[in-house]
């Protein structure tokens, strides 16, 4: 609305000679309100990156609509889903239904309508997707199921594209994103072949993109905003400790035994090329490196075992995210190219977390782990916006979350709020490895930092507080990338308490 039009609306009797003064008096408060509603200005930031993860969309949340969805083109799905009489958002312990998905995507647009780039760090499909489909449709024909999976992927892509029409949207596969079930994605397999066109169109790239998506579920592309910055997307499902088990239990997937080493070789070549071309690199992937702190703490009860327990029993309870060989080699690559790799982005854990990698010093490596949209693990749905500088370094980030999950639906809209801005909440100058390492140290020594970390970890959810006995296991995962490093923090430490994470 123009100044004159706003004046006529707000002060219709205003004399023309007073319009300039009136314009200032009327619009200055509006400008101040608008500035307050948006994100805070970032130091030297030139663009914003929108990151979402772990949607785990379940189009079958209302079983009465499934037959129509099966028969329809993805372009017709929204009309069908809008007919659902189940109006409530998915709640804690559930994957994302249509109402939550729509609300989350709309909140992303409101928070940042024109990001330089959108990243989705994996897991489009709901947990137990094959089982749910079979239980509702009673259709055991593999071709029918695969068609429904592909329609689901295409529908999510359509919804993202509808809201971010002119923006590159980058996907990376999650462990649930496959026809054959969890952790069973295959190099050159049917799922990667069938989704290549969708992933390429979202990324607004050409055929070279499709080739590496099909073969490895990975790709390399130039940053759309920053000259001299490259983005490498890695299908880290191949490196998962659970990938080998899945490959032997899903006979519908043809597993390439060399996929993990092929991916590492591909990464090493791309990093070498980037260094030679004087490019900087962002990495994105689904499963982060290091130790699964949640899985580790649950089978090993430190309280019942005593203060420190048996070192042997503690060590055997440690659950790695990746096969140790791939973790060690990845760690070595990050150390070798620490001046090239500027940041890494991951998902998978559903919580707001981070990893600090390598020794102290310049260019400390780190991984930002993005919160999930799905509230299945009792955290609040969330997403983040990252501000980056012209040289590819990160200035800051702001996390948004759904504040009224259990009450949203029907006439009650979802209330998405800014949860925190990194530099302000943690009182650090910028988003980098040094700041994250400082926070890691403060969590161990200051109760206020520890409590803040735990609060943000669950995206401000109080649905399932973290037991005191589990805190140290989660804390040690921040810096304990390898199993020996994690054990030295977790297994040899005193039982966690208020003074010791």
Locations of the language-model features?
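N-terminal secretory signal peptides that target proteins for export/translocation
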Residues: 1-19
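Bacterial N-terminal signal peptides
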Residues: 23-33
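Metal-dependent phosphoesterase/phosphodiesterase active-site architecture
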Residues: 40-120, 191-230, 235-273, 277, ...
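Active-site neighborhood of phospho(di)ester-bond hydrolases with catalytic His/Asp-centered motifs
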Residues: 51-53, 116-123, 164-174, 283-286, ...
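Active-site environment of divalent metal-dependent phosphoester hydrolases
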Residues: 58-61, 126-129, 171-182, 240-242, ...
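Core catalytic region of metal-dependent phosphoesterases/phosphodiesterases
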Residues: 73-183
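Well-ordered, non-membrane alpha-helical segments in soluble/globular domains
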Residues: 142-158, 192-197, 260-267, 323-330
